[in-house]
Amino acid sequence: MTQMSDEMKRRFDAEVAKYPAEQKQSAVMACLAIVQQEQGWVSAEAENGVAAYLGMPPIAVHEVTTFYNMYNQQPVGQFKLNVCTNLPCQLRNGETALQHLCGKLGVEPYGTTADGVFTVQPSECLGACADAPVLLVNDRQMLSYMSEPRLDELVETLKAAAK
């Protein structure tokens, strides 16, 4: 983030305005989300820009970015597929689902397809243990009971929707 766009600054201002002036650092998560929406990921340079804007030490912003798995710390594909691999999902084929997706798309975990359409990564608990294995698409859409046939169907549907 070499320079903050006027639109990004306007959006940051709107988030900061929700807090008392002496607590503007409370908007850090919202500002990081805005960066990610505009750029697709949160770079170290963007973290420094957010830190400067909010008057925070850069390490404090970096701690937020690295603590929450919703912030992409490297470029990702158009469709980011997070597969839960915590114990309840593991017991119901979560790891198998992850490996199936990776094999189908020809990537390792955390990898992005050569065409930039898919990134596949393991995930911490997504909070739907009874529906295991579960998968989250682009940090927004949760899908349950993701058997291999359902995973194959998802990949084909997303490929058809790719830009």
Task: Kindly label every feature range from the protein language model.
Residues M1-K163:
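Signature of N-terminal electron-transfer/Fe-S-associated modules in redox systems
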